[in-house]
Amino acid sequence: MSEPSWPIILKQLLAEENMSRKQSSWAMREIMNGEATEAQMGAFMIALRSKGETVDELAGLVDVMLENAVLLETGNDAVDIVGTGGDMFGTVNISSMSSIVAAACDVPVLKHGSRSASGKTGASEMLEVLGIRLDLSPQQVAKVFETAGITFFFAPVFHPAMRHVAPVRKQLGIPTTFNFLGPLANPVQPIATALGVSDKSGAPLMAQELQLRGRSGLVFRADDGMDELSTTSENSVWEVSEGKVVNHRVSAKDLGLKSTEITNLLGGDAKQNAHVATDLFSGERFENSEPIRDMVALNAAAGLVAYEIAKNPDSASGKLITRLKD
């Protein structure tokens, strides 16, 4: 096989031929070393997304991200509650609020996130408004985790080489393969992940990627496309434990929760979403507080169950609905 090059890889993707793990790693190194042009990066992201990713292609991309990540001394005994973004609904920051609730339940949380590339407001924008500093050093981030049992990894600090592709992602303004990478490339690789995926074909792919890396957790997607475990529609859930993936179907009714409409979960800019979070945590009642509260509680429960599965694989008994209700 000839050595990788952009013309070879792009021609291959346009012909809907899969890359090898080696080829996708080569492309990611070119990007992270600053050797790819914006045209090459944009063409690569669009062509790969259009073809549809494979487990090996994602693995090659994530391999290189982790090789270049800034290391952190926290250990990995924790859960990351995270979504790929890209559902384009503009809801409040469910996974960020759920992470705080999970930590309040004494489950350690190592949350990895960035600014929104294709949506309205990402986790970091809201957390910044709430007074969370994004420029902390790795040592300071680790100290916060030691003290509070929860910390936030701002992706640009821990994946500095991703700065080369960030402007292109923003210019494109649509979900790409790179939406999948952040949740998989948490620099400490926590033992558990509760991962929401908006893309229908991407959700089982992400479960297979966790399986490939020997990680545990829950991957979920709402039938309406939300990257959350949702009360707005039924959900598909992939439970990953000990190298196995088990598929479940879950609805609000199964869990004793009221169904709602996406319009009841819509957020705004970072300030508006931060205001929702502070009101929710202070027990204030506000417009749509009940459906938002239910969503936050449900996704926090997903984080607790994911962590339980990682700590005690025998708990992955198939009774997912019972565990989420508990």
Locations of regions flagged by a protein language model:
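A glycine-rich phosphate/pyrophosphate-binding beta-strand-loop-alpha-helix module
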Residues: 45, 92-148
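N-terminal small/glycine-rich loop or linker at the start of catalytic domains
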Residues: 2-15, 79-84, 110
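Active-site cofactor/substrate anionic-group-binding motifs, chiefly glycine-
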Residues: 52-113
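Residue-level signature of catalytic and energy-coupling elements of molecular machines
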Residues: 44, 86, 127, 182
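Glycine-rich anion-binding loops and their surrounding alpha/beta cores
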Residues: 2-5, 12, 18-19, 63, ...
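Acidic, glycine-rich active-site loops and adjacent beta-strand->loop/helix elements
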Residues: 83-88, 113-119, 158, 223-224
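Short beta-strand segments at enzyme active-site cores
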Residues: 40-41, 109-112, 219-220
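N-terminal glycine-rich anion-binding loops that anchor highly charged ligand groups
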Residues: 2-4, 11-57, 66-74, 295, ...
